[in-house]
Amino acid sequence: QSFADVMKAEGLKETSIRIYLTLIKVILNYARKMNYVTYLVHPFVLFKMPISNIRELDLSVDELKRIRDVKLFKSVHIMARDIFMLTYYLGGINLRDLMEYDFTKGNCMRYIRHKTRNSKKNENEIAFTIQPEAQAIIDRYISENGKLVFGKYKSYEKVYSLVFRHIGKVAGLAGINR
């Protein structure tokens, strides 16, 4: 417990302390399992892990509709909202997968997630029909090669930055303040 108190006194946040202590506990348990060390009393027997703060990240249907319907005037806000809503309409698609997809393949979307593409597990293809709400947004940004182009924001990093810099402002304009 005193080690956790020292870390807290040095300015570490609860989440960092949890991560460090969890890693130490894993190492100690492994060492005991491999008979590298023995304990009369396990070092963590009386220790209580710091509780992690739970942030509410989900939006209600009403809040989502307010984001969709809010009147926006700046093009960066409109674009950030469009990308946000498109990822929602496409089942939570990862931004990287969204930007790599060729939308000239028809109204049935099929892809393998970039994140799991090279994993040793089975490559699970994701397939679903593109709904009209999503198609309307796609039609605004589709290029000749079938990829989506968001104005001057061409790379994944630039588009990611655009969305995360402006979606909070869009939510605020929609009356969502949390």
Question: Which residues fall in each region the model found?
Answer:
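Hydrophobic (often cysteine-bearing) scaffold residues that line and stabilize catalytic clefts
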Residues: 16-23, 79-80, 159, 163
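Short, basic (Lys/Arg/His-rich) helix/loop patches that form interaction surfaces
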Residues: 69, 74-75, 164-178
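Basic, Lys/Arg- and aromatic-enriched nucleic-acid-binding interface segment
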Residues: 14, 39-95, 99
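Feature representing long, continuous alpha-helical segments
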Residues: 65, 88, 96, 132, ...
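Conserved tyrosine-mediated DNA breakage-rejoining catalytic core shared by Y-recombinases
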Residues: 45-46, 99-140
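Major-groove DNA-contacting interfaces characterized by cationic-aromatic clusters
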Residues: 52, 135-166, 172
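N-terminal DNA-binding recognition helix of tyrosine site-specific recombinases/integrases
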Residues: 5, 9-43, 91-93
